[in-house]
Amino acid sequence: MKEWIVATKNKGKVAEFEAILGKRGFSVKSLLDYPAIEDIEETGSTFNENATIKAEAIAERFQRPVLADDSGLIIDALDGRPGIFSARYAGEEKDDQKNIEKVLRELQDIPWKARTARFHCSIALARPQAETIVFEGTCEGYITTEPKGTGGFGYDPIFYVPSHDKTMAELTQEEKNKLSHRYHALKQLDKWLD
């Protein structure tokens, strides 16, 4: 069994990586397994840059392949915000509830048809002595007027997926794994592994 390090401490992201990579026979370790490693500062201006920064920093330390993801919510009516600042949109404490409240306040006068949004995910694969490769995926939807559902994490309770007539937080983990932005990026990685 091959072991991959996923450069995140986000349990929700780890679960998505495990669900998808586990089917391929990979074992997933995350930065939760290495508590001594400090957070990597995301100094990039794009999802791709931030994912690459994290993957390369951890790969250099461990001298083995590392996957890092940077993802976020892009809302058209907010000119792409929160974007790369999705996790800390309402402040550095990275509070999901406060982030949701801020988005809903900013969209309160925006009609449904203009509440289009997408989750974007960039996954960087960094390997010692090799060029870093980035895989991207998106999931299109709308921002609801109020949170619905208890599953998932982050903005899932306000991200409506038209094809399922539910928010991401109302989907089962299995349903989410088949349509999420991370799933689409991991599918690109999976193709590359073949």
From Swiss-Prot:
Gene3D superfamilies: 3.90.950.10. Its EC number is 3.6.1.66. One of its GO terms (cellular component) is cytosol. CDD domains: HAM1. The keyword Glycoprotein does not apply. It comes from the Bacteria. The active site is at D70 (proton acceptor). The keyword Secreted does not apply. GO terms for biological process: nucleotide metabolic process; purine nucleoside triphosphate catabolic process. Pyrophosphatase that catalyzes the hydrolysis of nucleoside triphosphates to their monophosphate derivatives, with a high preference for the non-canonical purine nucleotides XTP (xanthosine triphosphate), dITP (deoxyinosine triphosphate) and ITP. Seems to function as a house-cleaning enzyme that removes non-canonical purine nucleotides from the nucleotide pool, thus preventing their incorporation into DNA/RNA and avoiding chromosomal lesions. NCBIfam families: PRK14822.1, RdgB/HAM1 family non-canonical purine NTP pyrophosphatase. Belongs to the HAM1 NTPase family. This is dITP/XTP pyrophosphatase.
